[in-house]
């Protein structure tokens, strides 16, 4: 009887040993795979487990988001061919990314085309048709978006709320909107972020090339901006997060735009702007202001009356040079009493326009 029991146990052990390892091997095999999708729903629903996701000539249905915010950590996302979107009046976004250690890139010749002219009516987000935001780079951590070619977004292009995100060699071309009613087509809108590094961007649009509304440790370098509203901080104030700190905007050009360098804070709001540096910025064809810093914005427009609730401190303007149009203002500074301080102002040489007679409370060292 004892020998039978031993034989039974031995047989059981052999069966266990011979059984395949459970999910670990199959999971690892699946994780190492490249998944190619030709439909947005496939990518959204089946991306889990793919180490690389290839989006092959995706046509996103009207009113839907190409949602890649729930992919596995470490995933690489590749755009192939032309990505397009069906038409519907809605708020969007058309694309959403999220996750940790994510890489987003495209193959040669690919383009992400918003076909924004279907929505453009000259009003942007201020009225008319409801227009979808284009891309949300939200909840990304330790990630990179590189080499994307984006064309004709309905309104704002890339909204960033992230930690340690690199955006490298991004092209946003909304130049078709110049004559077709493009409006509020911001390039990069940054808020509630820590560590955002935008390098080598090319932006052609009808609004801010970059707008930093809140966040810290932000860099914009080697950028080329044209047609829009320039390199902007703000408007700061009136949001959940109203702190902008440690920003460097450097080695960039702004051409044929309303403004070159701009900082704006909200009338009667609270917050702070500190440790901001603009350096080696080249301007040409500026139509409104070469440099404009004002603490008077309300409902998206200047009031002419500055307030002190969002101080601008430790600001460096170094090597901002170039030309503005003859009816533009070279430099305009409108600060509240004592709310602009510790500024460094060097190598500013802007010519061709008018000198403002309306500057107020210009801090020591700056000139207006």
Curated annotation (Swiss-Prot):
Keywords: Cell wall biogenesis/degradation, Disulfide bond, Glycoprotein, Glycosidase, Hydrolase, Repeat, Secreted, Signal, Zymogen. The keyword Manganese does not apply. Residues 1-18 form the signal peptide. GO terms for cellular component: extracellular region. It is an enzyme of class 3 (hydrolase). It catalyses: (1,4-alpha-D-galacturonosyl)n+m + H2O = (1,4-alpha-D-galacturonosyl)n + (1,4-alpha-D-galacturonosyl)m. Residues 19-31 form a propeptide. Its EC number is 3.2.1.15. It comes from the Eukaryota. Disulfide bonds join 35-50, 209-225, 335-340, 359-368. It is found in: Secreted. InterPro entries: Glyco_hydro_28, Glycosyl_hydrlase_28, PbH1, Pectin_lyas_fold, Pectin_lyase_fold/virulence. GO terms for biological process: cell wall organization; pectin catabolic process. Coiled coil: none annotated. PbH1 repeats lie at residues 140-162, 167-192, 193-214, 215-235, 244-265, 273-295, 307-352. The active site is at residues 207, 229. Glycans are attached at residue 246. One of its GO terms (molecular function) is polygalacturonase activity. Belongs to the glycosyl hydrolase 28 family. PANTHER family: ENDOPOLYGALACTURONASE B, POLYGALACTURONASE. Involved in maceration and soft-rotting of plant tissue. Hydrolyzes the 1,4-alpha glycosidic bonds of de-esterified pectate in the smooth region of the plant cell wall. This is Probable endopolygalacturonase A.
